[in-house]
């Protein structure tokens, strides 16, 4: 899959976003909340922006960041799949320039799991053709 995505061309990359939210299927996750981390890739042609050096020919990283912040810090959801899906859909709505998006969303501190685990999460890919 990574090879297929690499063939798609240019992309904006946001790594290590951190927000506090109240998502999860366990009641304590909804009342206590926890940290969520994200990586986001947004595919688009960056050739014109690379030549013009003009933000109008690209998409602002801040706009993508704000979508992720709004969703993660917003209304509580039961599933990470839903949270990641909302981020992907709203990111595609930012600009018709964005042709596809990948969202990796994870919980670095998993509530109520009595085991050693680095994180739990989801990774989704959405493009305009399937959205």
UniProtKB/Swiss-Prot annotation:
Gene3D superfamilies the record matches: 3.30.1130.10
User: Does the keyword Thylakoid belong to this entry?
Assistant: no
The coiled-coil segments of this chain are none
- CDD domains named in the record: DHNA_DHNTPE
Tissues showing expression: Expressed in roots, leaves, stems and siliques.
Single GO biological process annotation from the record: tetrahydrofolate biosynthetic process
What is the superkingdom listed in this entry's lineage?
Eukaryota
What chemistry does it catalyse, as a reaction equation? 7,8-dihydroneopterin = 6-hydroxymethyl-7,8-dihydropterin + glycolaldehyde
Ligand binding (substrate) = 29, 61, 80-81
**Residues of the active site:** 107 (proton donor/acceptor)
Q: What is its EC number?
A: 4.1.2.25
Key words of the record: Folate biosynthesis, Lyase
Q: In which pathway does it act?
A: Cofactor biosynthesis; tetrahydrofolate biosynthesis; 2-amino-4-hydroxy-6-hydroxymethyl-7,8-dihydropteridine diphosphate from 7,8-dihydroneopterin triphosphate: step 3/4
GO molecular function list: dihydroneopterin aldolase activity
Oligomeric state and interaction partners are given as: Homooctamer. Forms a hollow cylinder assembled from two ring-shaped tetramers.
Q: What does this protein do?
A: Catalyzes the conversion of 7,8-dihydroneopterin into 6-hydroxymethyl-7,8-dihydropterin, a biosynthetic precursor of the vitamin tetrahydrofolate. Can use L-threo-dihydroneopterin and D-erythro-dihydroneopterin as substrates for the formation of 6-hydroxymethyldihydropterin, but it can also catalyze the epimerization of carbon 2' of dihydroneopterin and dihydromonapterin.
NCBIfam families assigned: folB, folB_dom
Write out the similarity annotation: Belongs to the DHNA family.
| Name by which UniProt lists this protein | Dihydroneopterin aldolase 2
């Amino acid at each position: 899959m990574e090879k297929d995505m690499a063939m798609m061309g240019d992309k904006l990359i946001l790594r290590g976003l951190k927000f506090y939210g109240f998502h999860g299927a366990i009641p304590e996750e909804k009342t206590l909340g926890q940290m969520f981390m994200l990586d986001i890739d947004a595919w688009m042609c960056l050739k014109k922006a690379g030549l013009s050096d003009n933000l109008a020919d690209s998409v602002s990283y801040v706009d993508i960041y704000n979508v992720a912040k709004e969703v993660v810090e917003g209304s509580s959801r039961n599933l990470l799949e839903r949270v990641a899906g909302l981020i992907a859909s709203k990111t595609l709505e930012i600009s018709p320039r964005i042709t596809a998006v990948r969202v990796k969303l994870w919980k670095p501190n998993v509530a109520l799991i009595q085991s050693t685990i680095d994180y739990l999460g989801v990774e989704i890919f959405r493009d305009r053709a399937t959205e």
